[in-house]
Amino acid sequence: MARGLQVPLPRLATGLLLLLSVQPWAESGKVLVVPTDGSPWLSMREALRELHARGHQAVVLTPEVNMHIKEEKFFTLTAYAVPWTQKEFDRVTLGYTQGFFETEHLLKRYSRSMAIMNNVSLALHRCCVELLHNEALIRHLNATSFDVVLTDPVNLCGAVLAKYLSIPAVFFWRYIPCDLDFKGTQCPNPSSYIPKLLTTNSDHMTFLQRVKNMLYPLALSYICHTFSAPYASLASELFQREVSVVDLVSYASVWLFRGDFVMDYPRPIMPNMVFIGGINCANGKPLSQEFEAYINASGEHGIVVFSLGSMVSEIPEKKAMAIADALGKIPQTVLWRYTGTRPSNLANNTILVKWLPQNDLLGHPMTRAFITHAGSHGVYESICNGVPMVMMPLFGDQMDNAKRMETKGAGVTLNVLEMTSEDLENALKAVINDKSYKENIMRLSSLHKDRPVEPLDLAVFWVEFVMRHKGAPHLRPAAHDLTWYQYHSLDVIGFLLAVVLTVAFITFKCCAYGYRKCLGKKGRVKKAHKSKTH
């Protein structure tokens, strides 16, 4: 250290003590959590872990039948009854995920997708009804005096509950269908350069892509109604007055968006929108002896991590065998999260596991590639750790995520329905052997990590902020209080247009009057002149 920068140790210790003593620590608060099951919960769980470490209490509300939400030390789990069993739930979920790999006629696939969407929507709504009509539980929640509700607005039940209990809400979200996030924040959303969800458009669109971008919401209007309208009806019933979907999504004090401008395209944001992309990369842990042994045995070739997310762990036999054949043709050891029937052609370099520490494996320097369904959870772990991807998107925003990463040169996208064993083999060899993929993902990783505050700390800060101040009304734009024609200034435009037209009309009338006067006078002069000459 330079002589001029040296500080005596006692003085340094005293300074640090003073700094800590004036730090505005939040008092212990109570957080009510209404999560969405699946990978969104896995990210939210990290925020709850940190809130617990800072002295806050969290209560997680969940149906007693679910996929991943189980009791843990850093929160209290409160489960409520639903009219189906775990076996029924698992069977239906497996049926949905198996359908991702079935080749069907376009209309049949669309029809099946609509049926799935409708069934999922009905199930979520039924869960919400069971929760809100559980009078004993609602009384208990009301008496507990929670400081904030943390919820994922993909399931609007959390918004209904927060509004019903009059507790400030923080939304923890990645995407909501039907642009409800833009409507809930009153954030500008021009279709000219902000691609709509599920379109796979970029922010630089051709004319036809802009046409598609504008018309796509109309095509999804049925899905939007199916997805959101039941919650508005339920809220209207509870409040005994008309409540719209926009009223529900506008209730949030702060929106914690699990994205950033490394993965997402530049777009406008509002003051109460906070970007926490990569929050799930926090709290990395050392690998167990089992996985360390797999990596050590891989030698100089390293490993490939293969997981299709929290929902998909079984694949139809024919497709599984094609995948296994491709995996056997690369020199790397493949760790494949898979619980289905073991493919008969599984090679010696491929190890099937029921669970794997995905983020910790991706963070190991011997990991060469990541085979993923391109969910935002996995994509961010790939970005955080700088691992190129082979992406096999299955549903939802995964197609958009894959398109963005492929455009940025961070991976290769395969159509899971059409890909062959050779396609997967070539894609793996490309991302492993072509240095450009590694360089591109490392560049994205460097950009993502170059930030003043870690995403987890930022998320926890804003939850504590809302608890301390009982909301954030100063961040709420006045646009929420305008009618649609006021928002677009149509009344002002109409008024100014009327003024211009009125002035133009008066000017025209004056000119016409003056013209007639002048013309009449000139005519009389000519007539008088003619009479004199005669």
From Swiss-Prot:
The keyword Signal applies. Glycans are attached at residues 119, 142, 296, 348. Keywords: Endoplasmic reticulum, Glycoprotein, Glycosyltransferase, Lipid metabolism, Membrane, Signal, Transferase, Transmembrane, Transmembrane helix. GO terms for biological process: bilirubin conjugation; heme catabolic process; negative regulation of fatty acid metabolic process; vitamin D3 metabolic process. Its EC number is 2.4.1.17. The keyword Protease does not apply. GO terms for molecular function: enzyme binding; enzyme inhibitor activity; glucuronosyltransferase activity; protein heterodimerization activity; protein homodimerization activity. The chain crosses the membrane at residues 492-508. It is an enzyme of class 2 (transferase). SUPFAM superfamilies: UDP-Glycosyltransferase/glycogen phosphorylase. Pfam families: UDPGT. Homodimer. Homooligomer. Interacts with UGT1A1, UGT1A3, UGT1A6, UGT1A7, UGT1A8, UGT1A9 and UGT1A10 to form heterodimers. Isoform 1 interacts with isoform 2/i2 suggesting that oligomerization is involved in negative regulation of transferase activity by isoform 2. Isoform 1 also interacts with respective i2 isoforms of UGT1A1, UGT1A3, UGT1A6, UGT1A7, UGT1A8, UGT1A9 and UGT1A10. UGT1A4 isoform is part of the UGT1A complex locus which displays alternative use of promoters, first exons and terminal exons. The locus is defined by 13 first exons, which are alternatively spliced to 3 other common exons and 2 alternative terminal exons 5. From the 27 possible mRNA isoforms, 9 produce functionally active polypeptides (UGT1A1, 1A3, 1A4, 1A5, 1A6, 1A7, 1A8, 1A9 and 1A10) called isoforms 1 (i1). Use of an alternative exon 5 (5b) as terminal exon is leading to 9 additional alternatively spliced products termed isoforms i2 and which lack transferase activity. PANTHER family: EG:EG0003.4 PROTEIN-RELATED, UDP GLUCURONOSYLTRANSFERASE FAMILY 1 MEMBER A1. This is UDP-glucuronosyltransferase 1A4. The lineage of its organism: Eukaryota, Metazoa, Chordata, Craniata, Vertebrata.
